[in-house]
């Protein structure tokens, strides 16, 4: 036979376990995936860029096989390409087509996977051939225009 006191104690434990179970998934849900963190970095690139069109993720290198700590910086390496969407359209990059002969940028740096305090330290270089020069004494070479864009967002 169960006493009222034992029943009350069992009810409290059940309530504590329920609350603990509800709290744990929300804590782990605050960690971004590697891809999500890179997409946020691309969004920051688009926000801070002064160029007329926005960029979209083209290629993402493999994630590092590090620890799963969302607060520790993760090395990232990816390429973005210019889209046909203007900065003024406010359209998500994923809905924009790549621009034919659009600029390509190689981006590297670190991101943290913490959804609330996500940090990005990304450097992007664009490399695009702009002309072929031919001199009588040398083989043709591509002249390259390089520009470095640095993104540092700390929250």
From Swiss-Prot:
What PROSITE patterns does its record include?
Answer: CATHELICIDINS_1, CATHELICIDINS_2
Q: Name one Pfam family in it.
A: Cathelicidins
Q: Which GO terms describe its molecular function?
A: lipopolysaccharide binding
GO CC terms, sorted: extracellular space
Using the record's annotations, give every residue carrying the modification Pyrrolidone carboxylic acid.
Answer: 30
Its domain of life reads Eukaryota
UniProt keyword Ribosomal protein present: no
Which GO BP terms, alphabetically? antimicrobial humoral immune response mediated by antimicrobial peptide; defense response to Gram-negative bacterium; defense response to Gram-positive bacterium; innate immune response
What is its biological role?
Potent microbicidal activity; active against S.aureus and E.coli.
- Compartment(s): Secreted
Q: Which family does it belong to?
A: Belongs to the cathelicidin family.
Residue ranges of the propeptide: 30-143
User: Which cysteines link up through disulfide bonds?
Assistant: 85-96, 107-124, 146-154
Q: What is its main location?
A: secreted
- Is-annotated flag, keyword Signal? yes
For this UniProt record, the keywords arranged alphabetically read as follows: Antibiotic, Antimicrobial, Disulfide bond, Pyrrolidone carboxylic acid, Secreted, Signal
Q: What is this protein called?
A: Cathelicidin-1
The gene from which this protein is expressed is CATHL1
As given in the record, the signal peptide range reads 1-29
Q: Which organs or tissues contain this protein? A: Large granules of neutrophils.
User: Gene3D superfamilies under this entry?
Assistant: 3.10.450.10
């Amino acid at each position: 036979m169960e006493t009222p006191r034992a029943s009350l104690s069992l009810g409290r434990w059940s309530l504590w376990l329920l609350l603990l179970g509800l709290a744990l998934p929300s804590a782990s849900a605050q960690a971004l995936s590697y891809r999500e963190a890179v997409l946020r970095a691309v969004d920051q690139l688009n926000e801070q860029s002064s160029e007329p069109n926005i960029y979209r993720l083209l290629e993402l290198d493999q994630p590092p096989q590090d620890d799963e700590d969302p607060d520790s910086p993760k090395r990232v390496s990816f390429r973005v390409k210019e889209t046909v969407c203007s900065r003024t359209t406010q359209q998500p990059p994923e809905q924009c087509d790549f621009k034919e002969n659009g600029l390509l940028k190689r981006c590297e740096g670190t991101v943290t996977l913490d959804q609330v305090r996500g940090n990005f330290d990304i450097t992007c270089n664009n490399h695009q051939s702009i002309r072929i020069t031919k001199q009588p004494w040398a083989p043709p070479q591509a002249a390259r225009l390089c520009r470095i864009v640095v993104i540092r967002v700390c929250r």
